[in-house]
């Protein structure tokens, strides 16, 4: 079907910086206060009822990480989860963020179903990463980060790709180092996650690893609401 909404994370842009405007789409952006860092954006064919930036907590709302578009039947949440960084310097902050963000999603979910899209900076299971054994202490595959994803799903959400493709090995991100993409030494860290009560409406969930142009590739959800 038609692509009605395109979400992008880590835009690194300030308002008005985009030099492209897809015809028939309206742009919504949320930039970090620090220039050239983080940021989220969404291009939509259908205008939302409302647009919200951040999660309403001062500590977490300086980096342009969460953009929420409300539609009659659902909330669309575009998220760029903080990276725990080399040496896990930001892991403690990441844990605080995870709990606050999950609470925010549950608040929305109490009103209407949620579709969460984004770079969630975690490979949830061993199937989601090429080199599981050597990355146990790497940002994005620590036990702590993986446990937070488990907690999110247990709170009433479904990982759309894994629901449709329980055993498929496919990645959405490859380091620019070590010829990782050529070797397909990747991670699946980009997701569409939906409220359990609309999971049966998923028609397709795909990872387009044939698309180049970034260290990430696009992920797609086709859902009939």
Where are the regions that the model predicts?
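Active-site metal-binding loops of divalent metal-dependent hydrolases
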Residues: 11, 120, 217
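Metal-dependent phosphoesterases centered on the DNase I-like endonuclease/exonuclease/phosphatase
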Residues: 26, 97-185, 189
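Acidic carboxylate-rich catalytic motifs and surrounding loops in phosphoryl-/glycosyl-chemistry enzymes
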Residues: 55-56, 159-168, 205-209
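Surface-exposed cleft-lining segments at the edges of enzyme active sites
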Residues: 56-57, 81-98, 133-137
């Amino acid at each position: 079907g038609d692509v009605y909404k395109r979400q992008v994370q880590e835009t690194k842009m300030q308002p008005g910086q985009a030099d492209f405007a897809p015809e028939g789409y309206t742009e919504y952006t949320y930039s970090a206060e620090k220039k050239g860092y983080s940021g989220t954006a969404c291009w939509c064919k259908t205008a939302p009822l409302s647009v919200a930036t951040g999660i309403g907590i001062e500590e977490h709302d300086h980096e342009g990480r969460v953009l929420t578009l409300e539609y009659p039947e659902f909330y669309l949440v575009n998220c760029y989860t903080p990276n725990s960084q080399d040496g896990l310097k930001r892991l403690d902050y990441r844990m605080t963020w995870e709990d606050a963000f999950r609470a925010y999603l549950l608040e929305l979910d109490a009103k209407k179903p949620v579709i969460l899209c984004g770079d969630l900076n975690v490979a949830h299971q061993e199937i989601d990463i090429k080199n599981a054994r050597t990355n146990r202490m790497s940002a994005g595959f620590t036990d702590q980060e993986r446990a937070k994803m488990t907690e999110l799903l247990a709170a009433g959400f479904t990982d759309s790709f894994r629901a449709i493709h329980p055993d498929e090995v496919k990645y959405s991100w490859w380091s620019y180092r070590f010829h990782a993409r050529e070797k397909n030494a990747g991670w699946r860290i980009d997701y569409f996650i939906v409220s359990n009560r609309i999971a049966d409406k998923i028609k397709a969930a795909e990872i387009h690893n044939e698309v180049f142009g970034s260290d990430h590739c696009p992920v797609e959800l086709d859902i009939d609401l």
